[in-house]
Design a protein with these regions (language model features):
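Alpha-helical transmembrane bundles and membrane-interface segments of multipass inner-membrane proteins
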Residues: 2-188
Length: 188
């Protein structure tokens, strides 16, 4: 039985199920490691920065400042109250389910997409944990250069951003290269 077929998402045998999950285990372990790093770094931020302390890492470029973000990315939609909190929790749960489904359907040789999905799973889960537990997401990493100031973020946000960029790159360029290769085969 070929477990890479997209139509075979639910394999019939337990061997096929173990095979399908086994080779993805490394990606899931990496996602779990990123999730744990995110949660540990947020716990550090609460202890070290919560009462207004700033830590400058590289003057004029990189520092840590504790913030609580009840909204979504870059502080948008912060006025949702309790409804907004649970709306974002449900949205994040649906996103985790969708990404995991896509992850399980991705062929084993598609490392970029599998890695992107692992990053997305780690990041979404990290922020979901904060939002469900606290009602907000802990952000503390600040990057700036001159007048440019990137919104405060955390490891989960970075994971989501990198995963989304990898997935977008794959969606844009892999189909293009597949089309080019198909066109070259037609010509020859």
């Amino acid at each position: 039985m070929d477990t890479d077929k997209k139509s075979d998402f639910f394999p019939r045998s337990s061997v096929a199920i173990r095979t399908r999950v086994a080779w993805r285990a490394g990606y899931l372990l990496a996602a779990f490691g990123i999730y744990m790093a995110d949660q540990a770094s947020k716990a550090w931020a609460v202890r070290a920065l919560r009462f207004g302390e700033e830590r400058v890492v590289i003057p004029g470029f990189f520092q840590f400042i504790y913030t609580e973000n009840p909204g979504i990315a870059f502080g948008q939609l912060q006025e949702g109250g309790s409804f907004g909190r649970w709306f974002f929790v449900v949205l994040a749960v649906l996103a985790v389910i969708a990404v995991f489904y896509y992850f399980m359907r991705t062929p084993r040789n598609d490392d970029r997409v599998l890695g992107a999905c692992a990053l997305l799973l780690a990041g979404i889960s990290g922020n979901l944990t904060d939002r469900a537990r606290l009602g907000y997401v802990i952000d503390f990493i600040v990057l700036h250069a001159g007048n440019f100031h990137w919104p405060t973020f955390n490891i989960a946000d970075a994971s989501i951003t990198i995963g989304a960029l990898l997935l977008a790159y794959d969606l844009i360029f892999s189909h293009r290269s597949t089309r080019i290769n198909a066109d070259l085969k037609d010509v020859s």
